[in-house]
Amino acid sequence: MMLLGASLYLNNTQEVSDEIDTANLYANWKMKYNRRYTSQRDEMYRFKVFSDNLNYIRAFQDSTESATYTLELNQFADMSQQEFASTYLSLRVPKTAKLNASNANFQYKGAEVDWTDNKKVKYPAVKNQGSCGSCWAFSAVGALEINTDIELNKKYELSEQDLVDCSGPYDNEGCNGGWMDSAFEYVADNGLAEAKDYPYTAKDGTCKTSVKRPYTHVQGFTDIDSCDELAQAIQERTVSVAVDANPWQFYRSGVLSKCTKNLNHGVVLVGVQADGAWKIRNSWGSSWGEAGHIRLAGGDTCGICAAPSFPILG
């Protein structure tokens, strides 16, 4: 193992010595991420979790999966998988949601599309949901911000907190989870505040009913029925998608292919490669993954084709 600059990245091509001083690596990691714990007991527990995660990444390096993507000791290295999932993977799929059947035979046959690198669009910086299960709000706002620029040539920085605090009547539950279509419904009925007027706090709050909500461009939403339709939709706009993000905890780079279709996280599809790999905008900050993004193997990987949708703008 070696430290590459400021990154605690485990190089796939390097043999990991059994003589590594895990305690020193842990100390470097804590310094990088400014971690301090409230008690010696908590410190010992977090070191144990860190060590377990280090061993998991070592084992991954020896597997065949490491040929297509890499892992690292990132900001989640002191969290167990259960803690990570309960904190960050809080998508609430409605019982009434119609999920598309998986299409194992889908193959993308188009050209590359990448809305993160398009001269017609001022691509917004990747945001960080923090320790709040508000992925659904960031997915909806991400699609709204980018698509409003693409389709209407208007630029906004919109408020996820407005959705967290105020869309409860639409069956969303703030930091305990929600659904992108429900967020689009809320915005269609009420408009949406700008971030400067309703800033993000990463916690549930009381709805600010008196705040101005100047964003009134949503007329509804469209649910996408298949991988084929998703591939067509990304040609013209970004798309909110639901995925299984359990295997994403330590993702660093490359094309991830192994996951289930248990939908637990809301993100934004922002591109597709010529080989069919999907490019995803996440909400865990720009230091996670590929500048805040992840690439998934083509087809219905991680359930990406199960429930895509996008807002209808006007």
Curated annotation (Swiss-Prot):
The keyword Protein biosynthesis does not apply. Disulfide bonds join C132-C175, C166-C207, C259-C302. Transmembrane segments: none annotated. Keywords: Disulfide bond, Hydrolase, Protease, Secreted, Signal, Thiol protease, Zymogen. It is found in: Secreted. Belongs to the peptidase C1 family. The lineage of its organism: Eukaryota, Sar, Alveolata, Ciliophora, Intramacronucleata. It catalyses: Specificity close to that of papain. As compared to cathepsin B, cathepsin L exhibits higher activity toward protein substrates, but has little activity on Z-Arg-Arg-NHMec, and no peptidyl-dipeptidase activity. The keyword Hydrolase applies. The active site is at C135, H265, N282. It comes from Paramecium tetraurelia. It comes from the Eukaryota. GO terms for cellular component: extracellular space; lysosome. Its EC number is 3.4.22.15. Residues 25-109 form a propeptide. This is Cathepsin L 2. GO terms for molecular function: cysteine-type endopeptidase activity. CDD domains: Peptidase_C1A. PROSITE patterns: THIOL_PROTEASE_CYS. It holds the Pfam family Peptidase_C1.
